[in-house]
Design a protein with these regions (language model features):
Chain A
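N-terminal intrinsically disordered/low-complexity leader segments
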Residues: 1-10, 74, 201-220
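Amphipathic alpha-helical packing segments from all-alpha helical-bundle domains
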Residues: 74, 118-144, 153-157, 164, ...
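Amphipathic C-terminal alpha-helical segment
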Residues: 96-100, 136, 140, 159-178, ...
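Short amphipathic alpha-helical segment with a characteristic S/N-K-E followed by hydrophobic residues
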Residues: 15, 30, 53-58, 69
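Amphipathic alpha-helical linker/stalk segments
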Residues: 61-87, 106-109, 119, 130-143
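Basic, helix-initiating cap at the start of DNA-binding domains
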Residues: 1-26, 30-35, 39
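Hydrophobic alpha-helical connector segments
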Residues: 74-103, 155-159, 203, 220
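Short hydrophobic/aromatic patch on the recognition helix
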Residues: 40-51
Length: 220, 220
DNA sequence: TTATTTTATGAACAATGTTCAGTATTTTTA
DNA sequence: TAAAAATACTGAACATTGTTCATAAAATAA
């Protein structure tokens, strides 16, 4: 009884890994039952013994990919000074992750979820992925009084939507500027959002001091 | 020589109209050569005498749809008071247009443009569509001193990206809130962006007075 | 070992994009 | 007007992809 379970999970894992590899290396347009099964070392028909349909399989990748995204952000920001600087670096690392794997962006934000079993959990992870990968830093900024707790939810959603909108235009090639320009615009808009909420009441009088740090930004 | 041209354009028009009708009524997933040709009254093979491929045909719709979007916004905002109020109403009307026709949103922002002939012009129209439908109002606000000319480009891009990000999440069902909540969040974020740029130097001291008008907002 | 259950598979079907050779229609020419 | 030529239209056919199903292969139980 238990062995059966283990073996089934193992084979599901082969298909899952094949799908993830394919999506990352060839993009979403190469993800189809025959290619997946080839990589997994099975016939395409076997896939249907383990997954309801290809949609089910593909959206299962979301959980793993979110984890990879989280780790990518952590590794690329750990040497940054805590606070606004690391927050900004986290947002950039998040963007970089999807620029590196446009197929994952399509999967996360554009692909029709169809009848995926737990749509709810997946969409929750997806839509708050940026918030989540920045969570520690949001908390840090609030705890240090860099950001005000009443404002932080609005700021989060501003940054979430502005970042995703910009990313969508870039990844789907609705804009033609190069990567460096993407990052410049990302910083500009991130700073504008953070700036608008500097505590203390007066313009430029708060503790965020986004402008100063802006000067030293250099795109990779 | 001239008649041939006219006739060819006429038949292209039948296919184009069929595609537009189909996209608006059934969505992008029903847009295929056989359905289009059925509606146009021709065989699916005939389509290839007039268009390179289906992608070419579908992206030709962008120009017409942009015009419809523009008109939709104009008609739904003409009774609004000029300035920030009409600006906000324009943004909402823009969002409403895509909520009504999600297939057009997919076409504009998500579909792979492939080898579409003038990618350049189409993507320009697409990515600046929100800016364009609000152009008169942006100009009005600047001319009346409601917004400062140096800030307006940054504000435009903030609103553009934040609006598209929110719309993407909503239309692709990555969030589960109802339409009324979408509009609430749209207003909240629009106001936050506009507020951050009130002229005069001090918080709440500028001429935008977004807060006051926020009170009277009622979602349809 | 033999019977039964489980697992894996290719054949086959449906939907869609595309090409092409042949048919129908229109236009040109004699 | 009638034959010839050019043009327009079409279904058959092929490729790709998702899915189902009968059956072969393998594992398990008797």
């Amino acid at each position: 009884m238990k062995n059966k379970e283990i073996q089934e999970q193992r084979i599901k894992g082969y298909f899952l890994q094949a799908t993830k590899d394919l999506l990352k290396s060839e993009g979403l347009q190469s993800v189809n039952v025959r290619n997946i099964a080839d990589r997994a070392g099975y016939s395409y028909a076997t896939l249907y013994n383990y997954f309801k349909d290809i949609n089910d399989l593909v959206f299962l990748c979301v959980y793993d990919f979110y984890g990879e995204c989280e780790q990518h952000v952590r590794e690329h920001t750990k040497r940054q000074e805590r606070g606004i600087k690391r927050l900004r670096a986290s947002i950039r690392a998040y963007v970089d992750f999807f620029v590196q794997y446009p197929g994952i962006f399509s999967l996360f934000f554009m692909e029709n979820l169809g009848s995926f079993k737990d749509k709810g959990r997946a969409t929750e992870i997806i839509s708050f992925s940026l918030d989540k990968v920045c969570e520690e830093e949001w908390n840090y900024c609030v705890s240090k009084g860099i950001l005000q707790v009443e404002q932080v939810e609005l700021i989060k959603s501003q940054i979430r939507h502005a970042t995703l909108g910009l990313l969508m235009l870039y990844i789907n090639q609705r804009v033609s500027f190069p990567y460096t320009e993407l990052i410049n615009r990302l910083y500009l808009q991130t700073n504008a959002i953070l700036e608008s909420c500097s505590p203390g009441g007066g313009r430029d009088g708060g503790g965020v001091s986004v402008h100063n740090s802006l000067i030293s930004i250099k795109v990779k």
